[in-house]
């Protein structure tokens, strides 16, 4: 078997994010590819007799060997999704996720192994819970999954980082890692030709064509229905099972079920379809306005502000097409908040007990009502709504 060695070195102070690959290409020679991550490699050839010497030299210079974490995925395909609109939806979301990965990482999904994902999650959890927010942990993360960075320092935290900056970095890396993991889980295997990707994921997505149901969806959206393009009913078996088990265990009733909105960028939507809205049990419990939870909105307008739709107020979207989730959630005794205080950043499931959700009312602290859930079993997917700008719907793209 041909020898391969893959090494990474990050030097933030010099804005250097370097890689060094050694690849045996014959019985007597090996090829070296080296350079800045994300740039075209500089290539040279050497006799195989100097392999060990060169390898040790690079390790002594501070390069980290990432070879064992690499995995090679075989090239297979999934069975085609029959419904045209559903196939188009999944294709678009895969493309959006793939583009985000390509613009942020210098490794492809096929070069990432489950071990790399697990190790990356461990590093991110260490960083999230480290009170000093040591940048060396971020450097380890960037070395494990090499990133495209024009200026490494831009991706690290300044010495005087505020809590919002810290949370933004954690959210950024969490979103990217979930995207990478979802794309990796979408790679077909040997028996994939017998299944669609949706079947592999225990996921059912069907277009909503019933006029009564469509009217109900639009009415619930209020003035935001102007952006409505189409809707799909989503059934994620894993999340649905967790939801109904929680529902039965806690003796909820039909009137305790609510349908609220959740908005996210296009690049995150495939991961949400696959995983649902899930909470990391190892994540820090502070940093968000009402603690670490699942944030939902009774009004579509608020959640649309977090989508990729052109003009979205919170993430400054630029896309003519975006997606909004309708989540089915259950609670019956919310903790009502009318005025926010800084101590609410550390709210948790146990701290609001015996209440089972936070309902933050619009007023002095918020423009719109907000609902926060601290147990992801209380939430499952109901619809994904396709949004389009009014100009696009009128054919003025």
Model-derived features: positions:
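Segments that shape or occlude catalytic/ligand-binding pockets
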Residues: 13, 40, 44, 50-60, ...
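Intrinsically disordered, low-complexity terminal and linker regions
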Residues: 1-31, 36-45, 49-268, 373-397
């Amino acid at each position: 078997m041909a020898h391969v060695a893959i090494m990474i070195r990050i030097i933030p102070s010099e804005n250097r994010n370097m890689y060094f690959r050694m690849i045996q290409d014959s019985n007597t020679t090996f090829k070296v590819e080296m350079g800045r991550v994300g740039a075209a490699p500089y290539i040279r050839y050497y006799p195989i007799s100097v392999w060990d010497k060169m390898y040790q030299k690079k390790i002594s210079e501070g390069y980290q060997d990432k070879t064992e974490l690499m995995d090679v995925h075989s090239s297979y395909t999934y069975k085609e999704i029959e419904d045209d609109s559903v196939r188009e939806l999944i294709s678009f979301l895969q493309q959006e996720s793939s583009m985000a990965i390509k613009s942020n990482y210098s490794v492809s999904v096929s070069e990432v192994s489950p071990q790399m994902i697990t190790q990356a999650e461990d590093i991110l959890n260490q960083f999230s819970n480290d009170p000093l927010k040591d940048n060396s942990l971020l450097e380890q993360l960037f070395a494990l999954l090499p990133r495209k960075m024009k200026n490494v320092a831009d991706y690290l935290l300044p010495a005087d980082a505020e809590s919002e900056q810290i949370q933004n970095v954690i959210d950024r890396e969490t979103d990217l890692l979930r995207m990478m993991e979802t794309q990796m889980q979408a790679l077909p295997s040997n028996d994939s030709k017998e299944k669609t990707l949706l079947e592999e994921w225990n996921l059912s997505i069907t277009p909503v064509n019933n006029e009564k149901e469509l009217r109900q969806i639009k009415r619930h959206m209020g003035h935001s229905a102007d952006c409505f393009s189409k809707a799909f009913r989503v059934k994620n078996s894993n999340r649905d099972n967790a939801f109904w088990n929680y529902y039965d265990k806690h003796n909820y009733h039909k009137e305790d079920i609510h349908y609220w909105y959740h908005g996210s960028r296009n690049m995150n939507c495939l991961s949400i379809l696959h995983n649902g809205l899930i909470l990391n049990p190892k994540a820090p419990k502070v940093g968000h306005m009402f603690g670490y939870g699942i944030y939902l909105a009774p009004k579509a307008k608020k959640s649309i502000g977090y989508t990729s739709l052109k003009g979205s107020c919170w993430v400054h979207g630029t896309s003519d097409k975006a997606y909004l989730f309708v989540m089915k959630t259950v609670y019956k005794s919310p903790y009502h908040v009318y005025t926010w205080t800084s101590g609410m950043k550390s709210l948790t499931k146990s701290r609001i007990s015996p209440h089972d959700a936070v309902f933050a009312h619009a007023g002095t602290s918020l423009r719109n009502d907000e609902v926060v859930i601290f147990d992801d079993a209380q939430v499952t997917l109901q619809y994904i709504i396709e949004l389009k700008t009014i100009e696009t719907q009128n054919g003025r793209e």
